[in-house]
Amino acid sequence: MAAMPKPSDSKTGGKATVLLGSQWGDEGKGKLADVLSGQMDVCARCAGGNNAGHTIVADVNGVKTKFDFHLLPSGLVNPRCAGFIGSGVVVHVPSFFAELDTIQKKGLNCDGRLFISDRAHLVFDFHQVVDGLKEVELGGSSIGTTKKGIGPAYSSKASRSGLRVHHLYDPELFATKFRKLVEGRFKRYGHFEYDTEGEIARYRAFAERLRPHIVDGVTFIHTALAQNRKVLVEGANALFLDIDFGTYPFVTSSSTSIGGVLTGLGIPPTAIGDVIGVMKAYTTRVGMGPFPTELHEEIGHHLQEVGAEYGVTTGRRRRCGWLDLVMMRYSCLINGYTSLNLTKLDVLDQLKEIKICVGYVVDGKELPSFPADLEVLAKVEVQYKTLPGWQQDISKTTTWEELPENCRNYVDFIEQFLGVKIEWIGVGPARESMIHRAG
């Protein structure tokens, strides 16, 4: 084990670039992660598990190849970039190996460059069973989880009964704690079918295969920063799925805001450099919960089809609506974005008029901020600003100046309302379909 590095000097040590979802997820973070990872030495995950979903098309030996990332950092598409799964992530080991095997079969060699913190908690198959049982129990009030066991694993962690990666290397302790953990779930949900002893044996085998990937996560990330390595932190999910600041209870079970970066990796605020918020040019969400700007008719269906709005992880159809700047202003306050990446702007190409939410009104009074109470959110009257569309294909544009005037006006309005520069603009699904506004 390497010696513990000295604390990073905020003036001379490296700074991590952080990439965060600013809405309800599915904003297209993977594409910018792919673009930025070409300049990075480390791409790190800090929270969540294999409930995330990033799709990237990369060149592998001269062939355009599609990769779906769920648990692994998508920066692995850059052959010189190390992938790191931090302490705040919950790891389902079978999914880790299945995903690793899949991307390696597609020609992406990850030998010696994929690491997991020894403090990360483990997700087991019984967590996934419990996830489904809990959704059934909730009935019509179900949250609409991915049923990947993420919530139950974080529940085990919070109740201090969970198992961490390092426990795999004390077989007797692992077996004892595992049996106790499963028994607790039997008492809560009844005796569901589960091979406890078979699972213990399976994880004993996993432990040996996993061993080359295990590191002291705190030492790993601080060494990278102390050596001025370029670190990209790839956020999972998004601000409105955050356990504290999202549309609770229709959220995930981890901190998906900037705070989760610090606690999930064990780094101080002084180690953070740029914080890039990724936002769609419209709004989508998966699952249940209020959605003020949701479109149910023709335009909503148009956004769904043209934007291919189906979840990477679940395949579920995403709900679509107009861009909500009340949401985005709240998101900017919490995460402190230094710049924004506006994605899928081309999906709006055919629309004659485009609406943007600029305010919420309840009982004749404008709300001063995004409400915590979902009962209030469900009854807001949305105030819209209507802008003319550009009604032409922008997917081949490569510079800001090439965009139609009405398109630039749309971007400018968002930027001025939020007070944050839109530095990156996605105009198509390809990696190259990204305009960078430098300066």
Curated annotation (Swiss-Prot):
It is an enzyme of class 6 (ligase). Disulfide bonds: none annotated. It catalyses: IMP + L-aspartate + GTP = N(6)-(1,2-dicarboxyethyl)-AMP + GDP + phosphate + 2 H(+). GO terms for molecular function: adenylosuccinate synthase activity; AMP binding; DNA replication origin binding; GMP binding; GTP binding; magnesium ion binding. Gene3D superfamilies: Adenylosuccinate Synthetase, subunit A, domain 1, Adenylosuccinate Synthetase, subunit A, domain 2, Adenylosuccinate Synthetase, subunit A, domain 3. IMP binds at D26, E27, G28, K29, N51, A52, G53, H54, T146, R160, N237, T252, R316. One of its GO terms (cellular component) is cytoplasm. Mg(2+) binds at D26, G53. Its cofactor is Mg(2+). It comes from the Eukaryota. The active site is at D26, H54. Substrate binds at V312, T313, T314, G315, R316, R317, R318. PROSITE patterns: ADENYLOSUCCIN_SYN_1 (PS01266), ADENYLOSUCCIN_SYN_2 (PS00513). One of its GO terms (biological process) is cellular response to cadmium ion. It holds the Pfam family Adenylsucc_synt. Keywords: Cytoplasm, GTP-binding, Ligase, Magnesium, Metal-binding, Nucleotide-binding, Purine biosynthesis. Its EC number is 6.3.4.4. Pathway: Purine metabolism; AMP biosynthesis via de novo pathway; AMP from IMP: step 1/2. Binds 1 Mg(2+) ion per subunit. It is found in: Cytoplasm. GTP binds at residues 25-31, 53-55, 318, 344-346, 426-428. Plays an important role in the de novo pathway and in the salvage pathway of purine nucleotide biosynthesis. Catalyzes the first committed step in the biosynthesis of AMP from IMP. Homodimer. Belongs to the adenylosuccinate synthetase family. This is Adenylosuccinate synthetase. It comes from Mycosarcoma maydis.
